[in-house]
């Protein structure tokens, strides 16, 4: 590696004494490197990070690069410092790996500094305690699950329910319609998705306000374990030095926990429940607590959380839940019904949905919507057995409102225009609340449910109904 972040000032030499997969034991006769020090072998092509000092002369390190070609007896150089990430205005619009090397086939950015990826969370006195709503332009989130500026939201779901699509739409809305920086951190996900995201953001013209950092699934566990810290270091620079608001999107936080589990197993630690590392809570807290709202700016984080086998009692999901101000659960059933985004409003929750923060009108509307959807969920079994006709008129009205609300809360995304042939829609909070309120007042009782599906503002439903009548008459 040739970047300035990993050069040694006064190298201390060690020698490899053991290689077991990604775990490397190194002997130093004079100076034992501290924990988190980066070591180079094979002329800098193999990079490892010290995780344990075994005795007065031996350290155990985890490889951040593949260890092919590494052998006992090879010399190892102590760089004298930790893993570092590039920061500065020059990193905008660029794509990096965990070492700060550019991976977008463009020259290295000028005017950058290098900072350690191991940084303490902001002090309690510096944290801001104001509760502000972060508007996304996505109806179902802004109305029922308002996100917190400087908070953490999790997108929980199994494979293929739309977590990555929802993340990319939020990037589009944040960069295109708000003055902020977006940092996308890909942890252990598919290389294809990263490349597609880069091209999509470039085509959308939002790349100048973005930074992308990737440690993909083909890379060693050490690399996937550290890439989240590298992305956070960049986010902290824009918050603290540039006084900008940052949207940090992590896809996927489960892969960070999974990489930590692999590292823990390789280091010989006793596994905990379901094979997870015993230090999972500490490792996750070390990452999550750095995401904070301070007096100089805010880092708002939205994290995709893969749920193994859709089991929400999995320790990885349980530990992640405890750090979040909003939990957005994506439902496979809703996805199969074509209700996108496939967010389950009854399973999802937000700490911001209180009258003191969002206001009395918004809170009352959100509660009424939840109540209507919950009543519909209870009536579904009766409808399946006896049919809609067997319900009382009052219950039939509830079902009609709930079905129209479900369809109104769907939304065409900018990032899926090429697949759906529907133009993307950004909906203001006021328009979304107005639409839900009018549906609950039965203003659209005569409107077919299909007219409310995949629209932006509620008035588009009337236009669709008129178009349908004109087509039918002609």
From Swiss-Prot:
Coarsely, its chief localization is: membrane
What EC number is given for this enzyme? 7.1.2.2
User: What does the UniProt keyword field contain?
Assistant: ATP synthesis, ATP-binding, Cell inner membrane, Cell membrane, CF(1), Hydrogen ion transport, Ion transport, Membrane, Nucleotide-binding, Translocase, Transport
Naming one, the record's GO cellular component terms include: plasma membrane
Q: Where in the cell is it found?
A: Cell inner membrane
Residues involved in ATP binding = 157-164
- Give the matching SUPFAM superfamilies: C-terminal domain of alpha and beta subunits of F1 ATP synthase, N-terminal domain of alpha and beta subunits of F1 ATP synthase, P-loop containing nucleoside triphosphate hydrolases
Disulfide pairs here are none
Q: Describe its assembly.
A: F-type ATPases have 2 components, CF(1) - the catalytic core - and CF(0) - the membrane proton channel. CF(1) has five subunits: alpha(3), beta(3), gamma(1), delta(1), epsilon(1). CF(0) has three main subunits: a(1), b(2) and c(9-12). The alpha and beta chains form an alternating ring which encloses part of the gamma chain. CF(1) is attached to CF(0) by a central stalk formed by the gamma and epsilon chains, while a peripheral stalk is formed by the delta and b chains.
> Which family does this protein fall into?
Belongs to the ATPase alpha/beta chains family.
Instruction: Explain the purpose of this protein.
Output: Produces ATP from ADP in the presence of a proton gradient across the membrane. The catalytic sites are hosted primarily by the beta subunits.
Q: What's the protein here called?
A: ATP synthase subunit beta 2
Q: Which organism is it from?
A: Polaromonas naphthalenivorans (strain CJ2)
């Amino acid at each position: 590696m040739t970047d300035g972040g990993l050069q040694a000032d006064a190298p201390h030499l060690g020698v490899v004494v053991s290689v077991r997969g990604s775990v490397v034991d190194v002997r130093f006769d004079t100076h034992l490197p501290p924990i988190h020090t980066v070591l180079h072998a094979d002329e800098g092509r193999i990079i490892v990070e010290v995780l344990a000092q075994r005795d007065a002369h031996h350290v155990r390190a985890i490889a951040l690069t593949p260890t092919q070609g590494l052998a006992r007896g090879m010399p190892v150089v102590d760089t004298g410092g930790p893993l570092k990430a590039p920061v500065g205005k020059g990193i905008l619009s660029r794509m990096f790996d965990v070492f700060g090397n550019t991976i977008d086939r463009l020259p290295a950015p000028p005017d950058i500094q290098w900072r350690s990826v191991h940084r303490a969370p902001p002090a309690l006195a510096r944290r801001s305690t104001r509760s502000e709503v972060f508007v996304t332009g996505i109806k179902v989130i802004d109305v029922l699950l308002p996100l917190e500026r400087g908070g953490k939201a999790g997108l929980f779901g199994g494979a293929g329910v739309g977590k990555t699509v929802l993340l990319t739409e939020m990037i589009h809305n944040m960069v295109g319609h708000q003055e902020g920086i977006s940092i996308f951190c890909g942890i252990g996900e598919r290389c294809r998705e990263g490349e597609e995201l880069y091209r999509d953001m470039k085509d959308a013209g939002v790349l100048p306000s973005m930074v992308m950092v990737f440690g993909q699934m083909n890379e060693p566990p050490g690399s996937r374990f550290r890439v989240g810290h590298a992305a956070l270091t960049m986010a902290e620079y824009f918050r603290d030095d540039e006084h900008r608001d940052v949207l940090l999107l992590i896809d996927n936080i489960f892969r960070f926990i999974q990489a930590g589990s692999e590292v823990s197993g390789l280091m010989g630690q006793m596994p905990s429940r379901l094979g997870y590392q015993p230090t999972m809570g500490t490792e996750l807290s070390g990452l999550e607590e750095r995401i904070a709202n301070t007096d100089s700016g805010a880092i708002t984080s939205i994290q995709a959380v893969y749920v193994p086998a859709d089991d929400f009692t999995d320790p990885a999901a349980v530990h992640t839940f405890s750090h979040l101000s909003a939990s957005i659960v994506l439902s496979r059933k809703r996805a199969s019904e074509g209700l996108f985004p496939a967010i389950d409003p009854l399973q999802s929750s937000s700490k911001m949905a209180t009258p003191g923060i969002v206001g009395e009108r918004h809170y009352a509307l959100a509660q009424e919507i939840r109540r209507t959807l919950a009543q519909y969920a209870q009536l579904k079994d009766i409808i399946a057995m006896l049919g809609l006709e067997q319900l009382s008129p009052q219950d039939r009205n509830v079902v009609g409102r709930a079905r129209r609300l479900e369809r109104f809360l769907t939304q065409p995304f900018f990032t899926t225009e090429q697949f759906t042939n529907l133009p993307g829609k950004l909906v203001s909070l006021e328009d979304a609340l107005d639409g839900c309120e009018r549906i609950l007042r039965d203003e659209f009782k005569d409107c077919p449910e299909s007219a409310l599906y995949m629209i932006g503002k509620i008035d588009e439903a009337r236009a669709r109904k008129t178009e349908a009548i004109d087509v039918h008459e002609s």
